[in-house]
């Protein structure tokens, strides 16, 4: 299935000069959504992983379904002040400024093997922050799965040390 058919480019969103990849048509099509989840679940079943980790918000949509399909635990990574218990916190750089990602202390167990799922790989900043959170939890990232890879925004060898799945490349 050609998943690109279900992604719509929205120019100048959320700001001038950005071309936003809208995945809602994919989510709205039961066959495309099922195919996406099945592809990601098959990928993580090939890895010896314990946990699926994903950042908000669109990462949650994919990763929770994949975790269910692969019978794996699901752990959330969120922006500050969204998780009610003690958290690990990592600051990371954005194009303009910094942001934070957080994970509950104790959600990942020492030596847990983790696959991270997100909708889009752009510069890799969010993903690196998640890797750092996993390390703080004394767990290990084994692999990553992305619906979309914006190859023009990062080095071609980014995250080569991991098993990486990319369903759509631009």
UniProtKB/Swiss-Prot annotation:
One biological process term in Gene Ontology: adenine salvage
Single Gene Ontology MF annotation: adenine binding
Gene3D superfamilies in the cross-refs: 3.40.50.2020
Keyword Cytoplasm found: yes
Gene Ontology CC terms, in alphabetical order: cytoplasm
Subcellular location, record wording: Cytoplasm
Membrane-crossing residue ranges in chain numbering: none
The family this protein is said to belong to: Belongs to the purine/pyrimidine phosphoribosyltransferase family.
Function: Catalyzes a salvage reaction resulting in the formation of AMP, that is energically less costly than de novo synthesis.
Protein's name in the database: Adenine phosphoribosyltransferase
